[in-house]
């Protein structure tokens, strides 16, 4: 065919090209595509190129970030893109006395159990709204307590707090002096909630401005929760299936999801790994103080 169009190619050149087979680079690309698919499947299919690259290298699969980016483009893959949806879950009572804002939008903590943030969000289901309460440790971004309910009741937030207290004290961790930050919602200003904080020597802090930036870290988690779990896997039937999925999501979020905002150098690490590293380093110092 080529010779008919004036292309002079030696027969041996043609047959060598035809029988050469797949190149080493092409074989490597096919292998990496399979690994990319696996990593994404193990992580709710929400990872973009950066996290896929980080996870592959954590597993000893050495590959350049640009290679992962190229292959994911070829595969038509991208990470979860976050947007914003809004439904009011805060019911402020402007007449009620509230604690001071001890955080002032500076969501930084030098160690675990120095600063928790708590907030409520919502999930639309065929059976109506499901409301979710979360408590997050600012140091590691670990979700330490959570609870779901079909009603936006005061006990919803309290149940999440109880789980957080139980999780930390069960591990032998001290909560004295911990600051608990929330918005102005009546759920967090209730008498029983305030009493439970005081019983554990936890100091209450409430945002002073009355907008989403008052509790930006909790809002950021809600965005991840929605765009990594709720929207991709919906629609939802009701409370039971949302609760079951949330249980798996929190376990993944705390122990396997890579976070790039926790460390000073923006390296990827899980909340559980970050806390474990802190206690390994702080252990000798804590022992020296108590001796």
Model-derived features: positions:
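Structured, non-catalytic alpha/beta "coupling" segments that mediate domain-domain communication
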Residues: 1-15
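Mobile genetic element proteins and their domesticated derivatives, centered on retroelements
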Residues: 14, 36, 52, 68, ...
């Amino acid at each position: 065919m080529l010779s008919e169009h004036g292309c002079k190619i030696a027969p041996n050149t043609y047959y060598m090209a035809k029988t050469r087979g797949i190149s080493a680079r092409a074989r490597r690309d096919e292998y990496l595509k399979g690994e990319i698919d696996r990593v994404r499947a193990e992580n709710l299919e929400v990872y973009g190129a950066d996290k896929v690259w980080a996870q592959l290298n954590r597993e000893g699969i050495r590959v350049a970030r640009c290679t992962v980016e190229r292959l994911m483009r070829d595969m038509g893959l991208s990470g979860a893109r976050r947007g914003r949806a809004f439904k009011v879950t805060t019911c402020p009572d402007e007449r009620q006395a509230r604690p001071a804002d001890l955080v002032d939008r500076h969501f930084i903590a030098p160690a675990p159990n120095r600063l928790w943030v708590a907030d409520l969000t919502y999930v639309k289901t065929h059976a109506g709204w499901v409301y979710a309460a979360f408590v997050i440790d600012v140091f590691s971004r670990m979700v330490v307590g959570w609870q779901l309910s079909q009603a936006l009741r005061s006990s919803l937030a309290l149940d999440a707090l109880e789980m957080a207290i139980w999780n930390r004290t069960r591990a032998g961790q001290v909560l004295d002096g911990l600051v608990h930050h929330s918005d102005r919602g009546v759920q967090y200003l209730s008498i029983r909630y305030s009493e439970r904080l005081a019983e554990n020597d936890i100091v209450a802090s409430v945002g002073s401005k009355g907008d989403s930036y008052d509790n930006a870290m909790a809002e950021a988690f809600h965005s991840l929760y929605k765009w990594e779990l709720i929207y991709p896997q919906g629609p939802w039937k009701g409370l039971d299936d949302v609760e079951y999925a949330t249980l798996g999501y929190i376990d993944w979020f705390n122990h396997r999801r890579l976070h790039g905002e926790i460390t000073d150098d923006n390296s990827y690490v899980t909340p559980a790994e970050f806390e474990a590293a802190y206690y390994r380093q702080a252990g000798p110092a804590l022992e020296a103080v108590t001796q």
